[in-house]
């Protein structure tokens, strides 16, 4: 967040800024979804409402993508994935419960777990597991946690867990009495094999998702949670106390957006081209140690030849070039001092221009740690 605030200040001053620190699509909502919202503004007052049609359409998504029969009554609409995560933690875990997640990982996991009175348990991962959690991590814990947050594709790495890995995680979690929260917010944004839902392997998993990423609707604040069987009514009691319903306009727009496949796949192709450009450019600049970006829109790169202070590295880069990237310390307080995250959810011309500036700048930086060698990340 410090880099984002600094980038905003530069923008206010009139400096050109290349926002590669945000996990926010630059593509915008599908045009027909926006038109649907306009039409509703002209015809409705817009009261509290939860769309039955949208819940049914989300259930159909699981059928079509994953071959799963999900009762629409198990789907609760939320004001984005972050409230869905808070709802899962508050509604299905007790104060003092230990909830585990991988490091590097999305900073909100640690913050949400702690803020809600549960105990964060960080599990370090590295290139040997593609920066992902696997069943061996859970087996190795002396005390099994009450919960485990799994993200595939993941933020900040973009790495995914394949079907065998998810199945092993589900089996190990079940054996040790661990309830899984699956953050599937980046589903749809994959560049090889499609992502599997944890529900394919654990029918009792808590699954959260959002319209912010694949559907390119971050500001519309709409997501959902698939509640485990028998828990939906319990969670709805929390919803009624927290936010009643998500924004009505967003629900109308999202229902249209879900069928805008050609537009959405066009967005994904933009990210795919940006990804290819960064994967070609960064190794040429000497940054070849990166996590495998199977999905999402991130590159997690080791800049350890240049720095042991990723925040200072990113601050200097921003001040001297206008290129904003995220310091690894935001995602991994232990090893993140020599990593950075690039977001390629920007337009193609901005991605290319940013890489030119970054490359010119990097070429002028000293490499005081270049003699330290590390194993390259497996593909």
Model-assigned labels for residue ranges:
Residues 127-193:
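Active-site phosphate-binding strand-loop segment of PLP-dependent enzymes
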Residues 235-240, 257-280:
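Structural signature of PLP-dependent enzymes
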């Amino acid at each position: 967040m410090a880099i984002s605030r600094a980038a905003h200040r530069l923008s206010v001053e009139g400096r050109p800024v290349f926002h590669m620190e945000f996990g926010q699509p630059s593509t915008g909502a599908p045009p027909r979804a926006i038109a649907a919202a306009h039409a509703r503004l002209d015809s409705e007052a817009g009261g509290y409402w939860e769309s039955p049609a949208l819940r049914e359409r989300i259930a159909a998504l699981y059928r079509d993508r994953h071959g799963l029969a999900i009762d629409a009554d198990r789907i609760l609409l939320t004001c984005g994935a972050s409230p869905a995560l808070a709802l899962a933690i508050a509604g299905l875990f007790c104060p003092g419960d230990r909830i585990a997640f991988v490091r590097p990982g999305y900073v909100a996991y640690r913050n949400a777990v702690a803020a809600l009175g549960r105990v964060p348990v960080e599990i370090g991962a590295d290139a040997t597991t593609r920066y992902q959690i696997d069943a061996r991590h859970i087996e190795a814990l002396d005390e099994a946690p009450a919960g485990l947050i799994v993200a595939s594709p993941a933020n900040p790495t973009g790495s995914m867990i394949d079907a065998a890995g998810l199945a092993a995680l589900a089996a190990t979690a079940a054996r040790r009495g661990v309830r899984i929260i699956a953050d599937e917010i980046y589903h749809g944004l994959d560049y090889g094999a499609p992502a599997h839902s944890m529900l394919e392997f654990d029918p009792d998993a808590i699954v959260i998702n959002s319209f912010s990423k694949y559907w390119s609707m971050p500001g519309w604040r709409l997501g959902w949670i698939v509640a485990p069987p028998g828990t939906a009514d319990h969670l709805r009691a929390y919803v009624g106390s927290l936010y009643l319903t998500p924004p009505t306009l967003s629900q109308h727009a999202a229902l249209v957006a879900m069928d805008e496949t050609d537009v959405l796949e066009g967005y994904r192709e933009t990210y795919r081209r940006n990804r290819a450009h960064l994967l070609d450019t960064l190794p040429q600049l000497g940054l070849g140690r990166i996590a495998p970006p199977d999905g999402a829109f991130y590159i997690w790169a080791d800049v350890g030849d240049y720095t042991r202070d990723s925040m200072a590295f990113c601050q200097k880069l921003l001040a001297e070039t206008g290129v904003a990237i995220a310091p690894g310390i935001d995602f991994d307080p232990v090893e993140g001092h020599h990593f950075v995250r690039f977001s390629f959810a920007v337009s193609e011309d901005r991605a290319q221009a940013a890489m030119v500036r970054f490359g010119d700048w990097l070429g002028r930086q000293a490499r005081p740690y270049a003699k330290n060698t590390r194993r390259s990340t497996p593909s």
